[in-house]
């Protein structure tokens, strides 16, 4: 599991390795046909600052080679803002005095119809807070079932699930999962997520392994850049 891999990584040694990279290391990484982890450290090091435009051009070239000159749009739809976590940066924080809403099946379908009136959108991202008791797997499965006649590509951004739960949702039309990981630094993770299910670091980072085990087609890990790692 990914959490086991993280245990073997020293933040101090990794930081030292990044800051020790030289101009020659950066140029070697830019010329490499396939980058290694060591090459990646060179490209995010202070020594790479003069090469930002070069990296931008390479990034554009590789992106066009992989995806073509296309733009793919998706619509995010919040099914509920109910959440049992206490993430310090989030407006859904359980202690925030705000009205909590969980859309009913009828309200969900009304939202789908409204989205289709906006344009020919086919990619839908269903988003929830973390409240498995009130908006758990069965609720998400129902939302996916309702969405299938309207959209061809269905993704979710919800609480981390068990492998068998991800697999269950694939049978309801799930194509992909997006999961935000605010930091991979275990100590700082505790500061940002003091209470709730999301405070379980290993459960969170190992979610990507469980998605793969379940056969989820598209797995999208996202990392915030404004939180100190």
Predicted region positions:
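Conserved SAM/AdoMet-binding glycine-rich loop
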Residues: 118-208, 213-218
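A structural signal for short hydrophobic/aromatic patches embedded in well-ordered alpha helices
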Residues: 40-43, 55, 111, 143, ...
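Short acidic (Asp/Glu) and glycine-rich catalytic loops that position anionic groups and cofactors
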Residues: 35-38, 215-219
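Acidic, proline/serine/threonine- and glycine-rich low-complexity intrinsically disordered segments
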Residues: 221-223
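N-terminal pre-triad scaffold of radical SAM enzymes
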Residues: 55-96, 100-124, 175-176
């Amino acid at each position: 599991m990914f959490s086991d891999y993280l245990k073997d990584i020293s933040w101090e040694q990794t930081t030292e390795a990044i800051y020790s990279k030289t101009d020659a290391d950066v140029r070697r990484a830019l010329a490499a046909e396939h980058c290694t982890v060591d090459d990646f450290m060179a490209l995010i090091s202070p020594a790479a600052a003069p090469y930002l435009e070069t990296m931008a051009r390479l990034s554009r070239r590789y992106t066009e080679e992989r995806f073509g000159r296309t733009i793919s749009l998706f619509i995010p739809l919040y099914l509920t803002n109910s959440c049992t976590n206490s993430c310090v940066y989030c407006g859904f924080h359980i202690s925030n005095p705000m009205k909590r809403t969980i859309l009913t099946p009828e309200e969900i379908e009304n939202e789908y119809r409204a989205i289709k009136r906006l344009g020919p959108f086919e990619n839908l991202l269903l988003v929830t807070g973390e409240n498995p008791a009130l908006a758990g797997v069965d609720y998400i499965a129902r939302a996916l079932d309702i969405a299938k006649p309207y959209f061809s590509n269905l993704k979710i951004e919800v609480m981390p699930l068990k492998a068998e739960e991800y697999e269950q949702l694939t049978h309801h039309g799930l194509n992909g999962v997006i999961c935000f990981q605010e930091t991979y630094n275990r100590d700082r993770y505790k500061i940002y997520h003091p209470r709730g299910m999301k405070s379980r670091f290993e459960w969170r980072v190992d979610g990507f392994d469980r998605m793969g085990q379940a056969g989820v087609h598209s797995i999208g890990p996202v990392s915030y850049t404004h939180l100190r790692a």
